[in-house]
Amino acid sequence: MGQRGISLKLAFSLALAGALLAFPADALEWKWSYQGEGVAASGTLITRDRPNADGFYEITGIKGEANGVAIAGLQPPGTSIPGNDGYPVDNLVRTEAPQLSLHGFGYALANGTYANPFYGAHFAKPDTYAFASDPTNHKTSEPAVTFTATIVR
């Protein structure tokens, strides 16, 4: 085997190792989206690979966009997104309806706004809602949304 063959094998091995390290073996990847009045969001969630006793998987990572703005990061569980104090997220999702918990998951957007989709069982019309806040401009919204999430690997 020539030097070129060894270099190609080494490059392939390094690329494969990098891919395996980038996606933990104990994680699942989900495709998710929601749409409602004035909002459309979608992307990828990374969760632990085992559900809790209620069938919920803990979300550990997020990528995507909302209304064309990139998602900058996941809100830590047990904390509230800015502008929604008193409503901490738990970052849980499951395969069966309702797919989100009462606390839902939260994320920051690159433009300084935040979102928290959740299942509002306590609302007059139980449904999935997406609380959105723009702390800089003191604006919030909470439309009902259609949420879907599916495990892809």
What are these regions (language model features)?
Residues 2-12:
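Bacterial N-terminal signal peptides that target proteins for export
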